Design a protein with these regions (language model features):
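Short, low-complexity disordered leader/linker segments with a strong preference
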Residues: 1-39, 342-343
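N-terminal secretory/targeting leader peptides
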Residues: 31-127, 135-343
Length: 343
């Protein structure tokens, strides 16, 4: 009888010890997961502009709010490779983020081109307001979910302009010109309506193509022209203001899904905070870089009547291209509604 009681007590002791050990192991594993450092490599094609500024602010916020559990690394000026390679890297988890205009992701989902629709955004202030629209954010952030991309931020960059080797002072000067555009049907169709020949090209190839005379110019952001010293090859910028340029931050869903829930919340929250801070910064930067360009080249505006004529010519481009695909048309309608709500 005593032996049986001893055996029972011994088993109970072992069971208790096992539970204690299991609990200690679980707590230790949880602490280990909490203490793990996650590297977040962010790539962008530009440098010293709003996209680069967003990266710096975002990384500073995330490192602080995560207590150092996320370590950010920023690679501007295509240091991680050409734009298509950076996007692929994000999809497969080789890098953690790409920052740039959504039109570069049309190969991932053609709806990313919807923000290229001309004539919907009136000015910088309107562009900033529309980026805060919840319905537009929800759509744009979710377009890449099935393709390994998690959208986290959107902000207004600036209106488009044409940088060219020869001055574009009138609408007729655009006709026959070979101009670089993003790989978006809406941008290409817009230039065709103006009589130009659109050529899709990644950013790293644009300046050499202008220098070599392979193209006459490009539809670009003035701040990119100025910070990358395009004035050494093409001294004329014409502010057409269409289409408006937006930037987005795209993270690797493969990487994001491995993060603990609290870090996911920090990233999503800080991404939006950084975008809100960068919006006014981008507006000021646009004005500053316009003055920088004037020191090296010329900034041209079309005559008011011709600017109005151009807007009229481009007005239906978005709706026409959107009709080619039901899901693109649905996305276009979301953008139109957001633009109207924030006008």
């Amino acid at each position: 009888m005593g032996f049986i009681k001893y055996a029972v007590r011994t088993r109970a002791t072992f069971a208790t010890a096992a539970c204690v050990m299991l609990l200690a192991f679980s707590v230790g594993a949880a602490r280990s997961a909490d203490d793990k450092t996650y590297v977040m490599k962010l790539g962008t094609a530009t440098i010293n502009d709003a996209q680069h500024e967003w990266c710096k602010r975002f990384v500073a916020m995330v490192e602080k709010d995560s207590g150092g559990r996320i370590k950010g690394e920023i690679y501007p000026a295509s240091q991680l490779g050409p734009i298509p390679r950076e996007i692929e890297g994000v999809q497969f988890g080789a890098i953690q983020g790409y920052i740039g205009p959504p039109e570069f992701l049309v190969g991932v989902d053609h709806r990313y081109e919807v923000l290229s629709a001309p004539g919907l955004i009136n000015d910088m202030a309107h562009g900033i307001r529309v980026t805060g629209d919840p319905e537009l954010q929800k759509m744009m952030f979710g377009l890449g979910d099935a393709k390994g991309i998690h959208g986290v931020a959107i902000w207004a960059s600036q209106p488009s302009s044409i940088v060219a080797r020869e001055a574009v002072r009138h609408l007729d000067d655009i006709k026959g010109k070979k101009l670089r555009v993003l790989a978006a049907d809406m941008q290409q169709e817009a230039l065709k309506r103006l009589g130009a020949s659109p050529i899709a090209m990644t950013l790293g190839d644009v300046l050499p193509a202008i220098q070599q005379g392979a193209i006459d110019g490009a539809v670009l952001a003035l701040t990119v022209d100025a910070t990358m010293r395009y004035y050494d090859a093409a001294k004329y910028i014409t502010e057409t203001n269409q289409p408006f340029i937006f930037s987005m931050a795209f993270l690797s869903k493969k990487w994001f899904d491995t993060l603990p829930g609290d870090l996911q919340t920090i990233i999503n929250t800080d991404a939006s905070k950084a975008a809100a801070e960068v919006n006014p910064w981008a507006a000021d930067f646009y004005g500053q870089e316009t003055e920088v360009w004037k020191q090296h080249g010329e900034v041209i505006s079309l005559p008011p009547a011709e600017q109005a004529e151009m807007i009229q010519t481009l007005q239906g481009v978005g709706a026409e291209v959107a009709k080619r695909s039901p899901d693109l048309e649905q996305a276009y309608n979301v953008f139109v509604a957001a633009a109207k709500r924030t006008k």
